[in-house]
């Protein structure tokens, strides 16, 4: 996927723009990020938050969720048509935490959706600024990816929990547009397609009539998005087969699960962007930084820079480790939930631990948790180096599918060889004789068997000093190969529940 050809860059997807040159992209992404910051500052004023309260990541998330809910047209329409008792469909809200007498207290705020939309538009030059909303969705999705494991969802669709590294973006809402589709992992797309096929099998009218025609168009579009993520001809040909099926059923589900497994070695191309909480953008705007004039990129040094000098707090439960909470948020900020821990550790400059070793639960606090015992602490979100985010699955230049790992989807474009247990992965292919046997399947299995873990990915790509903003001196790290690199390895992370 080296040739960009007709592909729009992330930033163009992110800003809904047509083809632009680098400066225009930087300016429009800057405008988007600056708009989020201006909106956040205005909300802090409206809610009368002190400086410290405005830097609390939990407050940031509540404010982000409120504006996303205000613009969720489908759900708003549904709520107005199905009124539930004691709930005003025109209002939205959430917990805001304030500092009172040396303690953190929770206050539930309710806000008029119309008013939120007005404040958001005003912060974004009177526009709807859908790109900014999608950006917030991706930040929430990255946070979920780093916090929860989707074992249950995988098992429900007949996939293997070991495929968790393919599940990036699995909690993104449907309405997240092209930018959302770009960051979804192969497993996420497969899961969406399987759910769709299962509905079609169980509900005779799913593919029929005017509605069914629209469903069919959506199905084919999702197939094309998934096809575009695969980097080998055989995988793409198999996707054509799934897309063209007259009446999708079990054969297609089998093919999709086969393709998802194959993606553990023949990696898909999945975009990664650093999306920061709104309060970070707010802090920068408040300090007089002009994002649009300076320009901004989600895949370069800018987010690292921003995190180097912003102070964000988080509420900490009594038995949680603040350093571990920081790691969780750092990973979410850089979309690194499925990155090799050795690469993340090198960039961050402190050891990044697997999820199972972290003494921390999610960032959000449930409404029934006791606030009396809550403390707050500063999140350490700084890094030692920065690296360019990647949208390749990490294949070598020879376009030969190179190694993946049962749990790595690279986030950073940094040279490494991707260790993987071929035996473990190939074992997953022996169990199931169902599905069509085809030249494509044979070809895919052959490619997987021939891929070598020793092959180096991202040749010559390295990390950069934070002073090296033009990325002139790559430092190519050497990694200790004995170290297991996956984050959800042997894990006991909580499940994600909607």
Swiss-Prot record:
Q: Where is this motif: Unconventional nuclear localization signal?
A: 1-18
Where does the record place the region Disordered?
1-22
Give the UniProt keywords, A-Z: Capsid protein, Helical capsid protein, Host nucleus, Host-virus interaction, Ribonucleoprotein, RNA-binding, Viral nucleoprotein, Viral penetration into host nucleus, Virion, Virus entry into host cell
Q: Which InterPro entries match?
A: Flu_NP (IPR002141)
Q: Name one GO molecular function term.
A: structural molecule activity
Q: Which GO terms describe its biological process?
A: symbiont entry into host cell; viral penetration into host nucleus
Grouped into one coarse class, the protein's main location is: virion
Free-text description of this protein's post-translational modifications in UniProt: Late in virus-infected cells, may be cleaved from a 56-kDa protein to a 53-kDa protein by a cellular caspase. This cleavage might be a marker for the onset of apoptosis in infected cells or have a specific function in virus host interaction.
The subcellular localization recorded is:
Virion; Host nucleus
The Gene Ontology CC terms held by the record are: helical viral capsid; host cell; host cell nucleus; ribonucleoprotein complex; viral nucleocapsid
The record's function comment reads: Encapsidates the negative strand viral RNA, protecting it from nucleases. The encapsidated genomic RNA is termed the ribonucleoprotein (RNP) and serves as template for transcription and replication. The RNP needs to be localized in the host nucleus to start an infectious cycle, but is too large to diffuse through the nuclear pore complex. NP comprises at least 2 nuclear localization signals that are responsible for the active RNP import into the nucleus through cellular importin alpha/beta pathway.
On subunit structure and binding partners, the annotation says: Homomultimerizes to form the nucleocapsid. May bind host exportin-1/XPO1. Binds to viral genomic RNA. Protein-RNA contacts are mediated by a combination of electrostatic interactions between positively charged residues and the phosphate backbone and planar interactions between aromatic side chains and bases.
What is the official name of this protein in its record?
Nucleoprotein
Species name: Influenza A virus (strain A/Gull/Maryland/1824/1978 H13N6)
Q: Which gene encodes it?
A: NP
């Amino acid at each position: 996927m080296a040739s960009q050809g007709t592909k729009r860059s992330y930033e163009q997807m992110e800003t809904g723009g047509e083809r632009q040159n680098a400066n225009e992209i930087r300016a429009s992404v800057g405008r988007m990020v600056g708009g989020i910051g201006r909106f956040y500052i205005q909300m802090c004023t409206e809610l009368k938050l002190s400086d410290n309260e405005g830097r609390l990541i939990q407050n940031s998330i509540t404010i982000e969720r409120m504006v996303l809910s205000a613009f969720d047209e489908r759900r708003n329409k549904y709520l107005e048509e199905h009124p539930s008792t004691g709930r005003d469909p025109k209002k939205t809200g959430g917990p805001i935490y304030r500092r009172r007498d040396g303690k953190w207290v929770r206050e539930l705020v309710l806000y008029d959706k119309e008013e939120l939309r007005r404040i958001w538009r005003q912060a974004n030059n009177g526009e709807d600024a859908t790109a900014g909303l999608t950006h917030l969705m991706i930040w929430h999705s990255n946070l979920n990816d780093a916090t929860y494991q989707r074992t249950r969802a995988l098992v429900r669709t007949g996939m293997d929990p070991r495929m968790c590294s393919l599940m990036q973006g699995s909690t993104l809402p449907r309405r997240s547009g092209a930018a959302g589709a770009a960051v979804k992992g192969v497993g996420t797309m497969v899961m969406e397609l399987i759910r769709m096929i299962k509905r079609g099998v169980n509900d005779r009218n799913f593919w029929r009539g005017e509605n069914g025609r629209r469903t069919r168009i959506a199905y084919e579009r999702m197939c094309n998005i998934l096809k575009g993520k695969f980097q080998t001809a055989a995988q793409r040909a198999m996707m054509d087969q799934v897309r063209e099926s007259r009446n999708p059923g079990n054969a297609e589900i089998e093919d999709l699960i086969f393709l998802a497994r194959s993606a553990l070695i023949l990696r898909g191309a999945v975009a990664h962007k650093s999306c920061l909480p709104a309060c970070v953008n707010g802090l920068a705007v408040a300090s007089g930084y002009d994002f649009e004039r300076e320009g901004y990129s989600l895949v370069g040094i800018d987010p690292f820079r921003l995190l180097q000098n912003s102070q964000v707090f988080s509420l900490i439960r009594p038995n949680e480790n603040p350093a571990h909470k920081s790691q969780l948020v750092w990973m979410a900020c850089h979309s690194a939930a499925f990155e090799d821990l050795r690469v993340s550790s090198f960039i961050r400059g402190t050891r990044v631990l697997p999820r199972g070793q972290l003494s921390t639960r999610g960032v959000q606090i449930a409404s029934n948790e006791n606030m009396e015992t809550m403390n707050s602490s500063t999140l350490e979100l700084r890094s030692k180096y920065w690296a360019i985010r990647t949208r390749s699955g990490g294949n070598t230049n020879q376009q030969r599918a190179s190694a993946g790992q049962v749990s790595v989807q690279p986030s950073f474009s940094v040279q490494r060889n991707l260790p993987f247990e071929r035996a473990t992965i190939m074992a997953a292919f022996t169990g199931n004789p169902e599905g069509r046997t085809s030249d494509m399947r044979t070809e895919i299995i052959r490619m997987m068997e021939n891929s070598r873990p020793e092959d180096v990915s991202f040749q010559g790509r390295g990390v950069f000093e934070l002073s090296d903003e033009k990325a002139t001196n790559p430092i190519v790290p050497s990694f200790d190969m004995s170290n297991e690199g996956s984050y959800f390895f042997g894990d006991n992370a909580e499940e994600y529940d909607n």
